[in-house]
Amino acid sequence: MDYLDLGPYSSASGTVRLPGSKSISNRVLLLAALAEGDTTITNLLDSDDTRVMLDALGKLGVKLARDGDTCVVTGTRGAFTAKTADLFLGNAGTAVRPLTAALAINGGDYRVHGVPRMHERPIGDLVDGLRQIGAQIDYEQNEGFPPLRIKPGTISVDAPIRVRGDVSSQFLTALLMTLPLVKAKDGRTVVEIDGELISKPYIDITIRLMERFGVTVERDGWQRFVVPAGVRYRSPGRIMVEGDASSASYFLAAGALGGGPLRVEGVGRASIQGDVGFANALMQMGANVSMGDDWIEVRGIGHDHGKLDPIDMDFNLIPDAAMTIAVAALFASGTSTLRNIASWRVKETDRIAAMATELRKVGAIVEEGADYLVVTPPQRLTPNAAIDTYDDHRMAMCFSLVSLGGVPVRINDPKCVGKTFPDYFNRFAALAKA
């Protein structure tokens, strides 16, 4: 197995320019593909997840012209030209879920599949929602999970669509992005949410990006969404992908643990991503944080004893960045509790179980529940722990922070960061100092 040894490091400082946001990149690629006109996308993330989306769009007949982190997408005016395709989408939820919805109304015969873990990640609630409007979708293996076979259906909307919101916000994102292309009797389609909607900031990203392409979604709280029906997305001409706020969390934490000053560029007050809220969580833990419209800077911890304050917080709104808090909790002066993180169970791996296992390797006492994690830091971190990453990019990036505790750490399968941030470890090493 490949591995990477890091540290021991005693400080971290400098400036890092963030790669484009994964969540925004794949949404914008699909919206541009469905729109009328050409869209020039800049600062597009180059990663495993965006590559599978680009490959799929190409197979569906979308004209793409790439040059570095810029991509010109020629829109299809709402209908993919390829009526048959076999689409491998890796472990990219941001590709599988929205593409499934778009393909379901396209009148073709498609197969959607991915890596084995993707075939363990639920999609049944989205399929149920699409079947309510006449989509023909079959499960090839296990009910409720990919791989999927999508066939031509008789698509019509004559009642509100109901979808669960408590498993993944990507189901709602997929419906919202596709439904404007479907005609409805009164010119609008209503989507109603069963249960509590998780990861609300990701829905906000979806709605804001749809607005950039000329379609406005109305919402009544977070339980009812009204989408204009039978309309066409219009290209905004140019759109820039802002930096990835989830990726920012590792560097911001490094600035707290390693003294800083450490500045990330590409996200800030003006960001549409909820994960900029990670900076607020760090402040609650005692970090010195300042922020501009497109930058955030951390300058160590505001305590003489040099430890973070423990935190007890609901992380429903920022589940991905919450993983970084779990590792930062190793550097706190007491026990931290991360609540409302049930969505971790159905991510790239079961992140609650994986995080608990690996935190224990570095000496923490960890209690895990169905939707929470309690982390009590050790007096001293265990050196030379070999961290398993479970083919999960965020596990690898989070545990790099252990090296800032003055102990070496080994990261197994470090290349898994290719999912969202192929150059992460080079960037981290440029900022961390012995």
Curated annotation (Swiss-Prot):
Alphabetized InterPro entries for the sequence: Enolpyruvate_Tfrase_dom, Enolpyruvate_Tfrase_sf, EPSP_synthase, EPSP_synthase_CS, RNA3'P_cycl/enolpyr_Trfase_a/b
Listed binding positions for phosphoenolpyruvate are 22, 93, 121, 170, 351, 394, 419
Q: Provide one Gene Ontology cellular component.
A: cytoplasm
Please give the Gene Ontology molecular function terms for this protein: 3-phosphoshikimate 1-carboxyvinyltransferase activity
Q: In which pathway does it act?
A: Metabolic intermediate biosynthesis; chorismate biosynthesis; chorismate from D-erythrose 4-phosphate and phosphoenolpyruvate: step 6/7
Which keywords annotate this record?
Amino-acid biosynthesis, Aromatic amino acid biosynthesis, Cytoplasm, Transferase
**Taxonomy, superkingdom:** Bacteria
* Localization: Cytoplasm
What Pfam families would the database entry show? EPSP_synthase
Q: Could you name the active-site residues? A: 320
- Keyword Transferase recorded: yes
Catalyzed reactions: 3-phosphoshikimate + phosphoenolpyruvate = 5-O-(1-carboxyvinyl)-3-phosphoshikimate + phosphate
Q: What is its EC number?
A: 2.5.1.19
Enzyme class, broadest EC rank: transferase
Major place of residence: cytoplasm
- Description of how the protein assembles with itself and partners: Monomer.
Provide the function of this protein. Catalyzes the transfer of the enolpyruvyl moiety of phosphoenolpyruvate (PEP) to the 5-hydroxyl of shikimate-3-phosphate (S3P) to produce enolpyruvyl shikimate-3-phosphate and inorganic phosphate.
Supply the NCBIfam families for this chain: aroA
Q: List the protein's name.
A: 3-phosphoshikimate 1-carboxyvinyltransferase
According to its UniProt entry, this protein's organism is Burkholderia ambifaria (strain ATCC BAA-244 / DSM 16087 / CCUG 44356 / LMG 19182 / AMMD)
Gene designation per UniProt: aroA
